[in-house]
């Protein structure tokens, strides 16, 4: 039977968990006063995902630091994002430590984003496993294949908007690997790159549907409206740069064996110790999900 590998976008789940409870002023402090709401929420989310997705293998990928190779391409990349709140700062390391204590494998490489490591893993093992990627980031849709699906997070711990390659083609009218070209035209306000000013998602998608690639659009400029021609010619350099930024790399120097990621049964003692250390929400959640003897 083919393995089922679940790859978690750790930073996406951590931020999501933090802001879901911080908005109500719930920071769930440990006995020493350290806030833990994001880290405990992250672990609870992964535990719940395991019961839903039933993976045989599991990996968690993390961003490592504020700058990556994309900042060398464009210094405005993600420059518009605010710094994390002070209460969240100790929870980055906390989340990774909790994951390791539970037995999950953490991966992060300086200079690369979690998305890039996810990309490397998905491409490395797409012929060996069924793969589910859990994230809130639609950029990952470009990784869809017949064996890789994307589970986009929704409200709570158990709701997902699941994309397969077939669903993506039906909805977008392009292949998943063409999605980065759409992003290059429309830009990404969250990541801070503009694409072609005046070209939105609808037009960007229509261009790639009709001309298939950035080169295809540029070779057919005379067939576009005068306004579209002007916009693309004015921002052609930014268009190419945005395409570099939108593509997920397969070049990150990740060394990992699928066998290292095998999920093993949990032991009650692991969560009892976490409860003693103040992580009571995790312990309670684990007991509600798993029949410890």
Where are these regions (language model features)?
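Single, functionally critical "micro-switch" positions that shape active/binding sites
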Residues: 8, 136, 199
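Noncatalytic, basic helical substrate-engagement surface that gates or grips nucleic-acid strands
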Residues: 2-131, 142-149, 154-158, 237-241, ...
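Acidic, divalent-metal-coordinating active-site segment for phosphoryl/phosphodiester hydrolysis
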Residues: 138-139, 202
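Non-catalytic nucleic-acid-binding/docking modules located in mid-to-C-terminal regions
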Residues: 2, 56, 147, 162-293
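Short gly/pro/ser/thr-enriched loop/turn and capping motifs at secondary-structure boundaries
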Residues: 139-142, 157-159, 215, 225
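Conserved RecA-like ASCE P-loop NTPase motor core of nucleic-acid helicases/translocases
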Residues: 131-137
């Amino acid at each position: 039977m083919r393995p089922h590998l679940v790859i978690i976008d750790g930073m996406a789940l951590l931020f999501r968990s933090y802001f879901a409870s911080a908005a109500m002023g719930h920071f769930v402090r440990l006995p020493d006063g350290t806030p833990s709401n994001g880290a405990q929420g992250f672990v609870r989310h992964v535990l719940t995902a395991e019961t839903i997705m039933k993976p045989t293998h599991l990996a968690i990928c993390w961003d490592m630091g504020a700058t990556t190779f994309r900042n060398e391409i464009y210094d405005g990349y993600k420059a518009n994002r605010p710094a994390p709140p002070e209460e969240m700062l100790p929870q980055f390391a906390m989340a990774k430590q909790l994951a390791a204590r539970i037995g999950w494998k953490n991966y992060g490489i300086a200079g690369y984003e979690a998305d890039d490591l996810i990309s490397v893993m998905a491409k490395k093992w797409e012929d060996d496993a069924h793969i589910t990627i859990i994230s809130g980031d639609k950029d990952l849709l470009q990784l869809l294949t017949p064996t890789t699906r994307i589970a986009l997070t929704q409200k709570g711990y158990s709701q997902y908007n699941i994309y397969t390659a077939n669903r993506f083609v039906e909805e977008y009218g392009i292949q998943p690997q063409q999605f980065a070209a759409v992003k290059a035209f429309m830009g990404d306000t969250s990541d801070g790159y503009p694409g072609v000013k005046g070209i939105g998602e609808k037009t960007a998608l229509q261009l790639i549907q009709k001309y298939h690639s950035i080169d295809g659009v540029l070779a057919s400029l005379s067939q576009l409206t005068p306004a579209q021609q002007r916009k693309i010619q004015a921002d052609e350099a930014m268009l190419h740069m945005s395409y570099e930024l939108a593509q997920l790399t397969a070049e990150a120097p990740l060394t990992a064996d699928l066998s290292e990621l095998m999920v093993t049964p949990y032991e009650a003692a692991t969560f009892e110790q976490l409860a003693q250390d103040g992580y009571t929400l995790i312990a309670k959640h684990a007991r509600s999900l798993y029949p410890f003897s």
